[in-house]
Structures are given as structure tokens and as C-alpha cells.
């Protein structure tokens, strides 16, 4: 979670220790605002990840963002997690390549999309099971930069010389800021009452097996 002013991060709180969204997010909001002598009324807008990602995490994050927007009368901005990752990497790599963010799904499956250097969508967001011929059509034409927490597990599968893997790129509120400000300036805001995150896959509830002692 972050607070930004004029495109710069002025406060950031992150946690990667597990699924603690329900207990941490509300605390982080209060802490960030208090530590910077702000209230929700001082915000221009609230940006939230629209997905894809964890069903529970997206649901809790969007619900909290909606609550702030309703309570303070602020606009809601939705940013694709994959687009945010691609934009962040494109800003620092500055290379005419295809940008392929990957979010880990399960086994050899990832949530992914393809963007060009300017952020235009080359291949829409989708779930894909990675095998050795994945992205062969793109890799035959230019470099493809792979990054995100889903890219680590496919390094040994995608062996093409044009496949470049960038380490240390993770989902972060800080990566959303550039696109969020761009959308805000363009008036690209969501209907707070009806906005729903992009889960990509339907949620399937499971019942844990009973442990045998």
C-alpha cells in the first residue's frame, strides 16, 4: 500500500508473509494516513489492483478501496496488476522488446499478458500453462522480457535465446502509481457501486481434509 504525490511515493507499507489481507490492509491505511498527517479527505483518488490475482486478496482490497471512496467521496481508479508490472519494467529497461509480466497461478500455469514498450496490449490477459513452445511466435521476432513471481518457475522451460528473465520484479503498490496518475488525468475512473475485480478464473471453494491424529 502506498501514498503518492506528483508521481512520487511518499509512503509505502508492504507485507509478503502470507494471506493476511483482512487484518493488515485496514491497519496500513490508518497508519499511512496518520504518519503523513493526512485523512482520506485529503486524497485526490484511490487506486486499486483490478487483478488478476488471488480471489480473496482482490475481494478484500477492492472492498476496502470502495469503502474509502464511499466514505470520503473520492473517485476509484482500477489498474491491472500485469499492466502495472509491465509499465514499471518498461520505464527502467527502455528497450524495444515485448514485455511479459507473469503472476504465479499453480503448477506451470501463470496469469500473463504481452505489452510493447509503450504499454500497448499485444496479447490480452489470460491464464497459460507454460511449455517449451509458449510465445514462440513472439520470440522469433524480438526479445521478450519475462518478469514477475510467475517467471521464476518457467526459466528452465523457455530456453529461446530471445527469452530474457528479469529478477526481483514483484507486485507492489509503488508499481501502480504511474498508470494510476495517467488514468486519473484522463478521467478513467470506475463506478464505485458496481466495480468488480477481474478474477480471471471462477472461485472454487474447497473443504480441507480432516486430519488423522
List each model region and its residues:
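N-terminal beta-alpha supersecondary unit
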Residues: 1-50
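Surface "functional belts" at beta-alpha junctions
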Residues: 8, 20, 75-171, 199, ...
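DPxDG-like acidic metal-binding loop motif
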Residues: 47-81
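Acyltransferase
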Residues: 166-213
